[in-house]
A protein has these predicted regions:
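Signature of Asx- and small-polar-rich beta-strand/turn repeats characteristic
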Residues: 1-469
Length: 469
């Protein structure tokens, strides 16, 4: 007996519809109208749609059970949760705000944490708030303070005791790590799990699902304390723009909070002398698939170079990093680890980001190791070329295509630390642009070596576009 042939491609909508319509004459001879307007055909097509959807989910069930193949965000979140990895939400951009006086005051002026400032742009307004207190001494006229992008929001709830459900927050773009919870004016601590929580541990968890809905979860009274019935719960968080919060220097110019000294309002000027960097949208599934196994291999402890790299690149706000030790440079001492850190969106990392990352790594490193964080060096690569276009091509359009191709080639997301720029790749890139006949490259003339701690970036572009003879 021959082996039965099973068709695995007849479970979609069209295949189900054809098969069901073909079976109708076998069941009855009274149904002869198969127009799309027929009520029976409408019902049949509805069942075909449901069957198509069920078949898809059944086929995808096996793929959704494994992290490398899962495509639905909620399934990736659940799989990562099994290995104690949590996908990052939006990350607030950080910068330094400089507060300036017209003349020194007779006393020290304290600018409290939470002072808000604004950058007015054509698209929208971007608000920053200081992350720490800053003081202008009476002999000086300015001070710099670290700041994060976002608007502070507060919500109040009432605890319902043992029957209470998780608290659902209204904010959808909550900055990663910005949630703070008070129960009866007593602050509780956020944890990633309740495994090490006791019955009196004032701990809570913040969980965000695939729809960006954030829930505050308390313990059950055994693993983590449970708020008393009727207790007031106050939740405070920062709502951020993510990657849109990255902006250039000297754009934050408005002070929204009032600053007083001895009851009098003090006029202050504000600006950001350095760019705002490190802002990022919620973590992508591709990044989670790559980062979660790397952090599991490190066991969240920094011992090897791979451990430091995994922990640094998994830190919110860090796009890429490079780890250097004594094996890479003779000037580096034993038991010293140097990290070049590039923030999300490119540019230099802010002082606030480096402080947070240093504290994070300090708690996970070997006690004898010294960690040094430094800014990346963006190595400009200038392009000087003579480009010959086919007859009939618009020369300005060809030029814009080449400029766009170069911008895409040197995009920050594509470049990695220490990766050389090959001459042949640049020639092939320009020669492959639509409308280009051939290219004569003057600069560069050979491969460009990029040293450790450096990232290639597009420099000056000089293109002589002419028609091919």
């Amino acid at each position: 007996m021959g082996r039965a042939s099973i068709t695995y491609t007849n479970k979609d909508y069209d295949s189900l519809r054809r098969e069901l319509l073909a079976r109708v004459p076998q069941l009855t001879d009274r149904w002869t109208d198969f127009n799309a307007s027929d009520l029976g055909v409408v019902l049949l097509e509805l069942f075909c749609g449901i069957g198509d959807m069920l078949a898809y989910y059944l086929d995808a069930q096996a793929a959704e059970a494994f992290l490398p193949t899962a495509r639905q965000r909620q399934n990736v979140i659940n799989l990562c949760k099994l290995i104690s990895y949590r996908l990052d939400g939006p990350v607030a951009a950080t910068t330094a705000l400089r507060f300036s006086l017209a003349a020194p005051l007779e006393a020290d002026l304290v600018i409290p944490a939470g002072t808000t400032c604004r950058a007015r742009l054509e698209e929208n307004d971007i608000v920053f708030e200081t992350a720490e207190d800053a003081t202008i001494p009476r002999t000086r006229t300015s001070v710099d303070a670290g700041a994060r992008q976002g608007k502070r929001k507060t919500e109040t709830f009432t605890a319902e005791g043992e029957t209470s459900d998780p608290i659902i927050l209204a904010g959808k773009e909550i900055a990663h790590g910005s949630i703070r919870v008070w129960v009866q004016d007593q602050e509780w601590t956020e944890v990633s799990h309740f495994q090490e929580s006791g019955s009196d541990s004032r701990h809570f968890m913040a969980e965000t699902d695939a729809l960006d809905i954030t829930r505050i979860v308390f313990g059950d009274g055994l693993r983590g304390a449970l708020p008393d019935t009727g207790a007031e719960i106050r939740v405070e968080y920062l709502e951020t723009l993510g990657a849109e919060g990255n902006l250039g220097p000297n754009l934050v110019t408005e002070l929204l909070s009032a600053i007083y000294l001895d009851g009098g309002l003090v006029p202050l000027a504000v600006t950001n002398p350095v760019p705002a960097t490190g802002g990022a949208d919620r973590e992508t599934l591709e990044h989670a698939r790559r980062q979660a196994p790397a952090e599991v291999r490190s066991l969240w402890k920094a011992v090897t170079k791979e451990d430091y790299l995994a922990l640094a690149e998994g830190f919110p706000g860090v796009a890429k990093a490079q780890v250097l030790d004594v094996n890479d440079c003779k000037n580096i001492r034993y038991y010293q680890v140097n990290l070049a850190v590039a923030p999300d969106g490119g540019g230099p990392p802010s002082t606030l980001l480096k402080q947070d990352l240093a504290e994070y790594l300090e708690s996970r490193k070997v006690i004898t190791v010294e960690i040094n964080l430094f800014d990346p060096v963006y190595r400009p690569v200038s392009i000087d070329a003579e480009v010959f276009a086919y007859a009939g091509e618009d020369l300005d359009l060809v030029r814009s295509r080449i400029e766009q191709a170069l911008a895409d080639f040197f995009a920050f997301d594509r470049m990695i630390f220490g990766a050389p720029v090959h001459y042949s790749d640049l020639v092939a890139l320009l020669d492959g642009v639509r409308g280009v006949s051939h290219v004569r490259m003057y600069t560069p003339t050979q491969d460009i070596d990029i040293r450790a701690g450096q990232i290639a970036a597009l420099g000056q572009v000089n293109l002589d576009v002419r028609r091919a003879s």
